[in-house]
């Protein structure tokens, strides 16, 4: 069995090599004299088709292809949090120290620091029976997160040795397990192939909302922990800011942010902002619980596929520890475009708009790895991976294949609308096009943790927004003054819902995050105004007087009231609504 093949054909990121008999699908190889990292994606006879994750310019036929014998894998262990990796888990800061501002081809840097010592604290005893997923020790990796050291998924047996508390590197043996096939030495470092999902005991119903602090998402289009959401929208509609808001404020324990084929300056913004931001829950830097994977548009196309899988594998690893993880992929369209390019190089039959026929199944494989699960191990830990994928349809056309296939898989659809963004309505989530299929699942949580009437108020507000859309056609023809008074009150209420509730300023220190109880009280106040105004109208009050009530100014400003002052101030506003409406 030869361990080396020879290049016979090169087409951009795709290379065909002969003499590769005995290799396996998705095996990792090192291509050419520069030892560029690649992955076998097709085997026929003794020829292998390889996609290369680095720039292939300058490689020539006849150069060697060296097999590694294993699939493309990520290294999992202390040192992941707070790091910035490229698509194949090479730490960018270390590469910069080695090669300067530009990544040189074939640069080989260990994913995790091998010489750094971590303080290991054992939590298991010698002699106890352990199996995959059991926690045997802890490492204080950052000020926010304790890294739990687990037995690898495929190991089961008796713990014969565990290291005492002390300083160890990720390669030091910290435990030994006596299995049926011999003694397994356990290190803090684990390797896992990126294309294979990590195992779990069972999937659970997603019935706990992922609270994001964004009113439009939480109240109207909730995503559950372990759920999947898609954010399609044209250029400039606010996809990246929406993703960054979720990364900052979502109540997940760990955030994995994958910049997949987006512009370099957007990733730079994340890299500059996140280290300065404070985690609202702990007061520590937000980077302490974040992993960034940067694979910008000027990096090699093939690595986009790897970066999405790298991100989800890291997310599953932290899920297995018992943490709730949120993964932001920005943007899955760039990954689909990479698939289209490689499919074209392979001369495969194109599907719709040139995308490969397997586009839907690849997207599904990725999103299906999200979920709220009972993790493997002796203890039943409940943890989740929630995935939010941005989609950038060319020209904002939501009927294109990537958006349509994503919609079939995801249960939450936050449609961003360019016309709303042009009106400076942010987040520009179109309340008529968007939907969430988790509303029925999460209403129990809202009822028991916030208010039993949450669903009633939410549905009433949605019905009013639908009614406004119907009335808009008449308004455009004859103007608002020609409408009956009841309809004018409806239009005024929906204007308040749009401007005072749905609009949210990501850069305002108070309005950037809105707690579930504040969201509910704000919505209740607006609906309360509508009900009292309608009652006043029926008693004969003129619509013009109701619309110009002074309390409306306070309703408009309620989103800027700090959380600690909010309960008292909102009560006062609600009392004024009742008083002013009854006195009209």
Curated annotation (Swiss-Prot):
UniProt entry tagged with the keyword ATP-binding: yes
Domain of life: Archaea
GO molecular-function term, one example from the UniProt record: proton-transporting ATPase activity, rotational mechanism
A single Gene Ontology CC term: proton-transporting two-sector ATPase complex, catalytic domain
Gene source species: Methanothermobacter thermautotrophicus (strain ATCC 29096 / DSM 1053 / JCM 10044 / NBRC 100330 / Delta H)
Subcellular location(s) of the protein: Cell membrane
Family annotation (PANTHER family): H(+)-TRANSPORTING TWO-SECTOR ATPASE, V-TYPE PROTON ATPASE CATALYTIC SUBUNIT A
Keyword Zinc: no
PROSITE patterns per record: ATPASE_ALPHA_BETA (PS00152)
Family from the record: Belongs to the ATPase alpha/beta chains family.
GO BP, one annotated term: proton motive force-driven plasma membrane ATP synthesis
Name the UniProt record assigns to this protein: A-type ATP synthase subunit A
HAMAP family: ATP_synth_A_arch
């Amino acid at each position: 069995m030869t361990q080396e093949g020879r290049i016979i054909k090169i087409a951009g990121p795709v290379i065909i090599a002969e003499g590769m008999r005995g290799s396996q699908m998705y095996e990792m190889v090192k291509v050419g004299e520069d030892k560029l990292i690649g992955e076998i994606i097709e085997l026929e006879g003794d020829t292998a088709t390889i996609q290369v994750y680095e720039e292939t310019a300058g490689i020539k036929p006849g150069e060697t292809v060296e097999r590694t014998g294993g699939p493309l894998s990520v290294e999992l262990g202390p040192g992941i949090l707070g790091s910035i990796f490229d698509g194949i888990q090479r730490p960018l800061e270390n590469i910069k120290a080695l090669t300067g501002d530009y990544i040189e081809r074939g640069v080989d840097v260990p994913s995790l620091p091998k010489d750094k010592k971590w303080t290991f604290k054992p939590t298991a005893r010698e002699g106890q029976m352990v199996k995959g997923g059991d926690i045997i020790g802890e490492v204080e990796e950052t000020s926010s997160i304790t890294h739990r050291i687990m037995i690898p998924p495929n190991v089961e047996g008796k713990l014969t040795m565990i290291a005492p508390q002390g300083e160890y590197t990720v390669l030091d043996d910290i435990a030994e397990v006596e299995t049926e096939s011999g003694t397994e030495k356990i290190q803090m470092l684990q390797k896992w192939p990126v294309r294979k999902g990590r195992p779990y005991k069972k999937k659970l119903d997603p019935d706990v909302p992922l609270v994001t602090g964004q009113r439009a998402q939480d109240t109207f289009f909730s995503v559950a922990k372990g759920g999947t959401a898609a954010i399609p929208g044209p250029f400039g509609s606010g996809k990246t800011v929406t993703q960054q808001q979720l990364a900052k404020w979502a109540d997940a324990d760990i955030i994995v942010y994958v910049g997949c084929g987006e512009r370099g300056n957007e990733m730079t913004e994340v890299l500059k902002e996140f280290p300065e931001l404070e985690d609202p829950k702990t007061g520590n830097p937000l980077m302490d619980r974040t992993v960034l994977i940067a694979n910008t548009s000027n990096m090699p196309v093939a690595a986009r596929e790897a970066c999405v899988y790298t991100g989800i594998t890291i997310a599953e690893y932290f899920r297995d520890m018992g943490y709730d993880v949120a993964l932001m992929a920005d943007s899955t369209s760039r990954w689909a475009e990479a698939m289209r390019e490689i499919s074209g190089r392979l001369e495969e039959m194109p599907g719709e708009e040139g995308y490969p026929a397997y586009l839907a199944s690849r997207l599904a494989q990725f999103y299906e790895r999200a979920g709220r699960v009972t993790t493997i191990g002796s203890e039943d830990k409940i943890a989740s991976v929630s995935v939010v994928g941005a989609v950038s349809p060319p020209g904002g056309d939501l009927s294109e294949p990537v958006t349509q296939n994503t919609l079939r898989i995801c249960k939450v659809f936050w449609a961003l609308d360019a016309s709303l963004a042009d009106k400076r309505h942010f987040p520009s989530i179109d309340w008529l096009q968007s939907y969430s299929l988790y509303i029925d699942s999460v209403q129990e949580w809202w009822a028991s943790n916030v208010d039993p009437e949450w669903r009633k108020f939410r549905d009433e507000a949605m019905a009013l927004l639908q009614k406004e859309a119907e009335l808009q056609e008449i308004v455009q023809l004859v103007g608002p003054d020609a409408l009956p008074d009841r309809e004018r009150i409806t239009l005024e209420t929906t204007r308040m819902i749009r401007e005072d509730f749905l609009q949210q300023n990501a850069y305002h220190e108070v309005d950037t995050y809105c707690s579930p109880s504040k969201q509910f009280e704000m919505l209740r106040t607006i609906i309360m105004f509508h009900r009292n105004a309608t009652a006043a109208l029926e008693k004969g009050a003129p619509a013009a007087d109701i619309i110009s009530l002074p309390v409306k100014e306070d309703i408009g400003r309620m989103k800027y009231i700090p959380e600690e002052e909010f309960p008292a101030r909102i009560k006062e506003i609600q009392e004024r609504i009742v008083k002013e409406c009854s006195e009209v």
